[in-house]
Amino acid sequence: MELFYVPLLSLFVLFISLSFHFLFYKSKPSSSGGFPLPPGKTGWPIIGESYEFLSTGWKGYPEKFIFDRMTKYSSNVFKTSIFGEPAAVFCGAACNKFLFSNENKLVQAWWPDSVNKVFPSSTQTSSKEEAIKMRKMLPNFFKPEALQRYIGLMDQIAANHFESGWENKNEVVVFPLAKSYTFWIACKVFVSVEEPAQVAELLEPFSAIASGIISVPIDLPGTPFNSAIKSSKIVRRKLVGIIKQRKIDLGEGKASATQDILSHMLLTSDESGKFMGEGDIADKILGLLIGGHDTASSACTFVVKFLAELPQIYEGVYQEQMEIVKSKKAGELLKWEDIQKMKYSWNVACEVLRLAPPLQGAFREALSDFTYNGFSIPKGWKLYWSANSTHINSEVFPEPLKFDPSRFDGAGPPPFSFVPFGGGPRMCPGKEYARLEILVFMHHLVKRFKWEKVIPDEKIVVNPMPIPANGLPVRLFPHKA
């Protein structure tokens, strides 16, 4: 079946390319105001350079697309065509600052059409508009002072997770376990679902959604895009069932108005006094669950990878975490004060996020014609900023491939150079939430085990986040009591 689709897709792409060839070249945007367009090529008609953009990630080198063109054109801004759209790629801290500082002035958020199709809004608004609504709703929930009450809960979930998934096992595959851990926390914190069977039922379709969100938007059976659309419908139906039950529980006094984001959404009206419908809430919870577990699960997986490869770094994390263990009474849960003591551990996690950023970059759209660095950017062009353009740039981070947590001592890296959570008004509101679940994971991991990689040279693929090709199998060595 898969072999059948290869020639079929090739013919489909060829037909589309030829059909639109004339239209594409007649409608190419031109420079204005006397400034040239950025240097670069737009690749094949319609397809553009989408394949090169995606395939370098599939091969484990997402930065290659960026750095090859930066070198070729001797420029921090270059043009391309991705997902059928003319685009400019902005590279470096100065470019990041420009884009982040001009959010909703010169640029606005943009997602490929595949995102809107995987996450269709029940209110007929775009994913961009839905995200704006969510960002207005979430800040209070994700403030550090609000998240403090969830630290003990995360600690309990982590303890249960390691007892059931790691202990008494010689080998484990890390990435699926990390996904289970972060998804379990997201389900509990966002919708108060914690029954393992119910969590597992929701988790299964999420892998397909994550793989298909940023993919070639061909909706044919067997494609990642088709699988993502089907899986999102399955999850949405399950979430509507959870929402209906919560409404009943709230009415009967069995649920609290402040217990989680779901209750907050059900009981909060907009400026006109209108409450969100069940489908609308399901859409938003679906997006939260994706964002609330995917990036952290990738980060936790790479923490395990790097600590296996760097015994001296492991030892530093172990010593710090054991000091916290020794300060606790038997059965006492982690508190905010304990998290604040995990300074070296968080430096290590930040270095992991620098070298393997779950968010490789993000798109913006030009709201009007503007110029930057002597180049004209036409209205409607898509703009892409890249984390790797600063994270592994030797001008920003000396010896960029060296793992060095001390980069984050003191004031840390230069502004706009370390961007695993984005920046500006669109910085991920769940940054502090992710910090907590990563540190709690590290605490439980190192106090229980040392480990080694089963596949020393395991390949890394990026689709759309970095993931070890085999899920990172490791051999566990429990600490002696």
From Swiss-Prot:
Question: Which InterPro entries does the record match to this protein?
Answer: Cyt_P450, Cyt_P450_CS, Cyt_P450_E_grp-I, Cyt_P450_sf
Cofactor section? heme
> Where can this protein be found?
Membrane
Q: Does the keyword Magnesium apply?
A: no
What keywords appear on the UniProt entry?
Heme, Iron, Isoprene biosynthesis, Membrane, Metal-binding, Monooxygenase, Oxidoreductase, Transmembrane, Transmembrane helix
Which GO terms of type biological process are on file?
Answer: pentacyclic triterpenoid metabolic process; sterol metabolic process; terpenoid biosynthetic process
Where is the chain membrane-spanning? 4-24
**Entry keyword S-adenosyl-L-methionine:** no
PROSITE patterns reported in the protein's UniProt record? CYTOCHROME_P450 (PS00086)
The Enzyme Commission number assigned here is: 1.14.14.126
Q: In which tissues is it expressed?
A: Mostly expressed in roots, and, to a lower extent, in stems and leaves. Accumulates only in the rhizome of plants.
Catalyzed reaction equations: beta-amyrin + 3 reduced [NADPH--hemoprotein reductase] + 3 O2 = oleanolate + 3 oxidized [NADPH--hemoprotein reductase] + 4 H2O + 4 H(+)
Topology in the lipid bilayer: Single-pass membrane protein
GO molecular function terms listed in the Swiss-Prot or TrEMBL record: beta-amyrin 28-monooxygenase activity; heme binding; iron ion binding; oxidoreductase activity, acting on paired donors, with incorporation or reduction of molecular oxygen, NAD(P)H as one donor, and incorporation of one atom of oxygen
User: GO terms for CC?
Assistant: membrane
Which residues of this UniProt protein bind heme? 428
The UniProt entry, under CDD domains, shows: CYP90-like
> According to the record, what induces this protein's expression?
Expression is not affected by methyl jasmonate (MeJA) treatment. Influenced in roots and leaves by relative humidity and soil water potential.
Coarsely, its chief localization is membrane
**Pathway membership, UniProt:** Secondary metabolite biosynthesis; terpenoid biosynthesis
Q: Which family does it belong to?
A: Belongs to the cytochrome P450 family.
Q: What does this protein do?
A: Component of the oleanane-type triterpene saponins (e.g. ginsenosides or panaxosides) biosynthetic pathway.
Q: What is this protein called?
A: Beta-amyrin 28-monooxygenase
Taxonomic classification, please?
Eukaryota, Viridiplantae, Streptophyta, Embryophyta, Tracheophyta
